[in-house]
Regions:
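Beta/coil-rich, acidic/histidine-enriched accessory regions frequently appended to metallopeptidases
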Residues: 1-3, 11, 19, 24-29, ...
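Structured beta-strand-rich cores of soluble
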Residues: 25-40
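Extracytoplasmic/secreted envelope proteins and their assembly/folding machinery
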Residues: 65-72, 135, 155, 159-162, ...
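Sec-exported extracytoplasmic/periplasmic mature domains
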Residues: 73-81, 140-143, 163-167, 218-226, ...
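Surface-exposed patches in mature extracellular/periplasmic domains of secreted proteins
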Residues: 78-91, 145-151, 169-177, 228-234, ...
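Secretory-pathway/luminal and periplasmic proteins that interact with or process carbohydrate-rich
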Residues: 96-102, 166-171, 243-249, 280-281
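Acidic/His/Gly-enriched intrinsically disordered linker/tail segments
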Residues: 128, 149-218, 223-225, 231, ...
């Protein structure tokens, strides 16, 4: 979930929005909440400060720190470096178990990125090992803040990139994320009265419609470049041009930079096709082309499928290698 300025960019009802607003700012802005301990680490050209708020956790802080480091390493591996040079994470204990809420802001108190994580006091190591949300929130730092009608791009990117980054880092297997995509991508299909991604702000279209855009773009870029480049190259170029969460950009500017990096027009053309009209994706056909075959609750791969090499390239650890945290 991403917060930009004073508007919470999340496809939820007005009543739910009011409740989230009240919870987030009940004790003042989250970045001003009390801190009882603090640690920092370096990764991929960045310094990440991790603060722990009031309250206790069943887990030692060192185990929580390792979870944050693993998530940062996944994102830095995908982008070749951590997207912003100064980042802050606030861990606030709360009653319950698991990661209860995550929100990311840009340009707060000297930090390019600031993420607040509400972590259940009874959270276990297994919960952290299986978590996706910390990585999702870090991905938000790697794209400029957009006007509200483009929330689908911000959330869709984080939804699509998070599992791929974790595979590239070695924390997930490709079979797992392709099975998850086969299961979840249909949630982004347009329904009746859909008016395109810029104008249809349901939860499904915001998160999974945005993810469908990213998957299509990744495959199309690789098709047009003989698999030499993909969405990853476009997104790295956007970050390298300064397109991070603390900057307000028009979406088209970011897409044009990405297209220039891949030598294609895929991002701009796909956006123009999907922005104002429903454009259903033939997911069944795409899975077949990629060689992803349902097998019980999971999937198996057909490495002789027409686009099998593209599927493999999407999750392959980049040539720049794994980026590890340092003290």
């Amino acid at each position: 979930m991403k917060w930009r300025g004073m508007i919470l960019v999340c496809a939820i009802s007005c009543l739910a929005l009011a409740a989230v607003l009240a919870a987030q700012f009940r004790s003042g802005p989250p970045w001003r909440h009390p801190v009882v301990s603090s640690q920092s680490f370096h990764i991929g050209g960045a310094v990440i400060q991790v603060d722990f708020g009031l309250g206790t956790l069943d887990l030692p802080h060192d185990q929580v720190m390792q979870w944050v480091k693993n998530s940062a390493s996944s994102v830095a591996t995908y982008y070749g470096r951590f997207p912003v040079s100064q980042d802050r994470v606030l861990i606030e204990p709360a009653d319950g178990r698991d990661i209860l809420r995550g929100t990311t802001w840009g340009g707060v108190d000297g930090f390019q990125g600031f993420t607040r994580i509400v972590l259940g006091k009874q959270t276990t190591q297994q919960d952290l090992d299986e978590d996706w949300e910390m990585t999702h929130e870090f991905v938000h730092t790697a794209f400029p803040s957009l006007d509200d009608e483009h929330t689908w791009m911000e959330e869709g990117l984080a939804t699509y990139i998070e599992p791929i980054a974790r595979v590239q880092r070695g924390f997930l297997r490709p079979e797992r994320i392709w099975a998850d995509m086969m299961h979840d991508m249909p949630k982004g299909d347009p329904e009746s009265l859909d008016r395109g991604l810029d104008n249809t702000h349901t939860w499904g279209r915001t998160y999974w419609g945005g993810a469908q855009f990213c998957l299509q773009a990744d495959v199309m870029i690789r098709q047009q470049t003989q698999n030499r480049k993909g969405l990853q190259d476009a997104l790295r170029a956007i970050v390298n041009a300064g397109g991070t969460i603390d900057k307000d950009w028009p979406l088209r500017k970011a897409l044009e930079i990405g297209d220039s990096a891949t030598g294609t027009h895929v991002l701009v053309q796909l956006y123009d096709a999907m922005r104002d009209a429903p454009k259903p994706v033939d997911l069944a056909g795409l899975w077949k082309q990629l060689g992803v075959i349902r097998d019980g609750d999971g999937v198996r791969f057909d490495d002789h499928a027409p686009l099998a090499a593209i599927r493999q390239a999407i999750t392959r650890t980049p040539a720049t290698g794994i980026v590890l945290p340092k003290p």
